């Protein structure tokens, strides 16, 4: 699967490895630059996240995930992902997401959602923008 720029987060790259829109699960590899911040969000299903290089954390916790770490997020988890400003290398992750990710405003209201279907479409749009043919092997 090709790496393509993630149009939702400038400076990031994504590689969608698998998307099962019927089961509501997808596997995504990401390359995240220093200083990245992702909006506060809640997961309706479990998330498994492997850190392959670099470091990242959640604003709500002191722990920083580093290369070689694994993180399990239970359904209902709410957090704000960030990559430290002083990272000296790109952070690369592999994430398996079940269910929906709900992006929240400061009051906790849902302002956007993503899931296997929206990530599949976003990947296709990013492939087209990068002039990369749509891979057919990522669907169940």
Region spans (language model):
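A short secondary-structure junction signal
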Residues: 28-29, 60, 105-108
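Short acidic-glycine-tyrosine-enriched beta hairpin
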Residues: 21-22, 48, 56-80
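Ligand-binding loop in jelly-roll beta-barrel domains
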Residues: 66, 75-106
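Short intrinsically disordered coil segments
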Residues: 108-118
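A short, N-terminal "cap"/entry segment at the start of jelly-roll beta-barrel domains
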Residues: 1-24, 114, 121-140
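Short, conserved beta-strand element in jelly-roll/cupin
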Residues: 31-33, 41-58, 94-99
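Short glycine/proline-enriched turns and hinge-like loops at secondary-structure junctions
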Residues: 25, 42-44, 63-64, 85-86
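Conserved short histidine dyad/triad with adjacent acidic residue
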Residues: 11, 15-18, 23-42, 74-78
